[in-house]
Amino acid sequence: MGTSQADKDKHHDRIVAIAATRVRERGLDGIGVADLMKEAGLTHGGFYRHFGSRADLIDEAVERALGEGTKRVASGPKASGKNRFRTIVDGYLSSAHRNSPGSGCAVAALSSEAWRGGKRVRQAYTRQVKLYLALIEDMIDGRRRPAVRRDSMLALSALVGAVAMARSVDDEQLSLEILSCTAEALKSLVAHS
């Protein structure tokens, strides 16, 4: 008996969802097809009914992981402007976010990986960076445009870089200090704008 299109779509979605989590946790090369399909409860042989290649899976997984970040921001804190920015900074630069790359921001998780990806991966990453820059610009209003753009670039770079560094060091105290000092500096930045 064959599989219905609805079941195939459901399976495809499950595979991509798991891969989106794994790509944030393990990077672009950290996903094995056999293990992924097993985790999805499907056979290894069924992979090619869903994807033309492993690269196609990675492209979809990265797009999904990045898109989930957009949804999180949209459903996030309801404060506006600078207050919203401060709330986002506190959540983003938390030990909970640092400790959960699989459910965290894909821009941070893939910051040292995206350049190795194919065209779709880099385009998706670029779109997400531009989206986050625009969101930050909207939150830190009140300055002439060039300064807002510069400050949003600084803020996004600091957020992503701090999380990447905090995840990478093997000294818990240093990791927490990276997060807290960056949060303090970013809040100071918007307080003076």
Regions found by a protein language model. Give the residues of each.
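Hydrophobic alpha-helical connector segments
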Residues: 60, 74-104, 155
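N-terminal intrinsically disordered/low-complexity leader segments
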Residues: 1-10, 193
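Solvent-exposed, amphipathic alpha-helical segments
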Residues: 14, 18-25, 72-75, 158-165
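Helix-turn-helix
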Residues: 14, 18-56, 60
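Amphipathic alpha-helical segments used for helix-helix packing
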Residues: 84-87, 99-126
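Hydrophobic/aromatic-rich alpha-helical bundle segments in the mid-to-C-terminal region
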Residues: 119-127, 140-193
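Short, basic, alpha-helical segments at the C-terminal edge of helix-turn-helix-like DNA-binding modules
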Residues: 63-69
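Active-site oxyanion/phosphate-handling segment shared across diverse enzymes
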Residues: 129-139
